[in-house]
Amino acid sequence: MKKVMELVDVWKIYDLGEVKVEALRGVSFEVFEGEYVIIIGPSGSGKSTLLHILGCLDRPTKGKVLIEGEEVSRMGDRRLAQVRNRKIGFVFQSYNLLPRLTALENVELPMIYAGVPAKERKRRAKELLELVGLGDRLHHRPNQLSGGQQQRVAIARALANDPVFILADEPTGNLDTKTGEEILELFRKLHEMGKTLVVVTHNLEMVDEGTCIVRIRDGRIEGIERRGVVYGDT
């Protein structure tokens, strides 16, 4: 299997003057193409910090982060922004859609930054919205959509540049049970399509869906389970 991401002995230390906080302590793991990775752990375990490192939104204090074999942890800001735009698709708990743009325009946005021609990006945005079941909501703005529909737009946007992997932060966290199940089904569909998914969640149903479960506690990897094989402490 092709390795799409790797963390090697990653530490994140926050210097708060007299106190140093070790948010991540020697984290190492790999993500392979087509995996459905679920990251779980209690509050304060380092999940949010790990999410930021995985998404190239923050840099490790020490250690390496590699995407498709290329070390990204020491890249300059401009190059790192290109990596985020082209190789990572983000899905946030709060959707993060631009309120003045339509669903179609929100999905087009990452492609504009990537330099995709207007005709092609409109075609692809429409195709992606149809994929997530919103072919009849192309020209609706976020305030005209339900929470579940907004999250579907966010998922379509995440797929816009055909990223190496999708990184999702509590994608069902703001949704009711029924709508959350619909989003869960959509992630299931993406996994079946061969997409690589990395999800931070408390949703136990999502944990059941994952092909790789990463458990984090006190800034360390407590264990990694892959299809019945367990690595690390149990």
Swiss-Prot record:
InterPro entries: AAA+_ATPase (IPR003593), ABC_transporter-like_ATP-bd (IPR003439), ABC_transporter-like_CS (IPR017871), ABC_transpr_LolD-like (IPR015854), MacB-like_ATP-bd (IPR017911), P-loop_NTPase (IPR027417). GO terms for cellular component: plasma membrane. Residues 5-234 form the ABC transporter domain. Signal peptide: none annotated. ATP binds at G41, P42, S43, G44, S45, G46, K47, S48. SMART domains: AAA (SM00382). The keyword Acetylation does not apply. GO terms for molecular function: ATP binding; ATP hydrolysis activity; transmembrane transporter activity. One of its GO terms (biological process) is transmembrane transport. Keywords: ATP-binding, Nucleotide-binding, Transport. CDD domains: ABC_MJ0796_LolCDE_FtsE. Belongs to the ABC transporter superfamily. This is Uncharacterized ABC transporter ATP-binding protein TM_0352. It comes from Thermotoga maritima (strain ATCC 43589 / DSM 3109 / JCM 10099 / NBRC 100826 / MSB8).
